[in-house]
């Protein structure tokens, strides 16, 4: 413990010299130049004018020259030390900043003012304006009609076009209804096979811009007529319902008697009586149940 305290007592804290190494080298170079100029002036002033040379003068001149050489050598030593210190500090600073990576500074490139250079950027195509009006010509209509009526065009996918092949026939065209509004441009009535059934189909070509409410209503009515058939219910009175039941029973019993007589010729003849609804007593209905919902096709 005493040794540690003794070692701490030896430590002396001194402020570091933050001056740059370049300033120190410049100051030392200026001091050397000043010392050399002072020595030259002193030599010029101390020289006598044409005295006779003697041993004392030679000895004094040699002594002065020795002094100057010693001073110059000291200055050179000081310069070398300062250069070494500045170089070591510079290396340490660069090593700490770049972490041991040595990089070479390249000179800046000269800018080339070439205004006729072609731009290398990829130019975007100009957006096409959407057409608000549909251009309908006779040629375009014929091409559309050819696509729908030709059987040779097989390159179209089912999502783009219908997969029904249609064949024109004059007989179906004569029996078709004439709808001038729906078939304003061109129409053809075809016989189409769909799920094993032959259906009549009219194809119309229009520009797609002119839409009429009457035309849409007619199309909806046609769709309901073909695909939306239902049994229509009709109200009838109870007496009419009883009469229809009696007729149906009588016809059924007579058909049964004829079948038995023709089928068994050797059978024993048994007296048969025809039974009617008058013999059957139906319960009396109240006034609230006078009418009943019955299908119109029941006869």
UniProtKB/Swiss-Prot annotation:
Main location per the UniProt record: nucleus
Domain of life: Eukaryota
Keyword DNA-binding belongs to the record: yes
Role according to the record: Potential cofactor involved in sensory organ development. Despite its interaction with the Polycomb group protein Asx, it does not regulate the expression of homeotic genes.
Protein name: Protein tantalus
Assembly and oligomerization: Binds to DNA in vitro. Interacts directly with Asx.
A biological process term (GO) from this entry: sensory organ development
Disulfide links within the chain: none
């Amino acid at each position: 413990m005493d040794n540690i305290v003794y070692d701490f007592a030896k430590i002396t804290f001194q402020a570091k010299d933050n001056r740059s190494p370049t300033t120190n080298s410049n100051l030392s170079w200026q001091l050397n130049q000043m010392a050399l100029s002072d020595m030259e002036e002193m030599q010029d002033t101390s020289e006598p004018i044409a005295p006779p040379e003697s041993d004392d003068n030679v000895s004094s001149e040699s002594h002065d020259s020795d002094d100057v050489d010693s001073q110059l050598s000291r200055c050179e030593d000081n310069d070398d030390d300062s250069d070494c210190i500045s170089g070591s500090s510079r290396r340490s600073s660069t090593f700490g900043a770049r972490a041991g990576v040595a990089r070479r500074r390249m000179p800046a490139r000269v800018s080339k003012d070439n205004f006729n250079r072609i731009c290398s950027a990829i130019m975007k195509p100009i957006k096409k304006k959407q057409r608000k009006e549909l251009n309908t010509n006779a040629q375009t209509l014929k091409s559309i009609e050819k696509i729908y009526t030709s059987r040779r065009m097989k390159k179209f996918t089912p999502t783009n076009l219908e997969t029904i092949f249609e064949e024109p026939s004059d007989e179906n065209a004569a029996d078709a209804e004439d709808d001038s509004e729906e078939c304003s441009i061109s129409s053809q009535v075809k016989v189409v096979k769909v799920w094993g059934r032959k259906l009549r189909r009219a194809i119309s070509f229009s520009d797609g811009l002119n839409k009429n409410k009457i035309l849409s209503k007619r199309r909806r009515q046609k769709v309901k007529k073909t695909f939306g058939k239902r049994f229509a219910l009709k109200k009838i009175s109870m007496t009419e319902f009883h009469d229809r039941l009696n007729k149906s029973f009588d016809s059924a019993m007579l058909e049964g008697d004829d079948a038995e007589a023709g089928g068994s010729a050797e059978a024993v003849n048994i007296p048969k009586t025809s039974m009617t609804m008058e013999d059957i007593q139906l319960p009396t209905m109240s006034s609230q149940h006078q009418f009943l919902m019955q299908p119109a096709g029941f006869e």
